[in-house]
């Protein structure tokens, strides 16, 4: 007999079932997989938005372009989002297929590393976007977002998507650590 007064068979007790309730781990697996899929969608969105982002302006005989690969920070942003969305797709699938404690531990650690990478890339890109919007008066760097307005709006959208992806992944890390505290 259990402490609640119900009788559990050995197989039910081993699986964590009590009064017909499903174990909490399966709900946790699904929640973490959902968070990874949301992070996947957000980072894929940020990636696609940035690689398709360009704007051309013509002033008299001069034509100027603004493209994501003109900035090292934006290149890092694109690469980090690409790595993240590929990893997140595989991690979500693996997390649903296998519930091995060793795999769970490795995925939590990899989730943490990818979340750091996303935060690093998004922060660097945010700094460049800030300068593009506001400029810096001392070295004479002028703001370009008044001229390349559409380009700057796309960068802002990609940054929001990336930070959302980071948030979803960070929540997944916390849930994964709670589920498997020996992972970290």
Swiss-Prot record:
Pfam families: CASP_dom. Residues 1-30, 98-111, 176-184 are cytoplasmic. GO terms for cellular component: plasma membrane. Keywords: Cell membrane, Membrane, Transmembrane, Transmembrane helix. The keyword RNA-binding does not apply. It is a multi-pass membrane protein. It is found in: Cell membrane. Its main location: membrane. InterPro entries: CASP/CASPL, CASP_dom, CASPL. Residues 52-76, 133-154 are extracellular. The chain crosses the membrane at residues 31-51, 77-97, 112-132, 155-175. PANTHER family: CASP-LIKE PROTEIN 1U1 (PTHR36488:SF8). Homodimer and heterodimers. Belongs to the Casparian strip membrane proteins (CASP) family. This is CASP-like protein 1U1. It comes from Marchantia polymorpha (Common liverwort). The lineage of its organism: Eukaryota, Viridiplantae, Streptophyta, Embryophyta, Marchantiophyta.
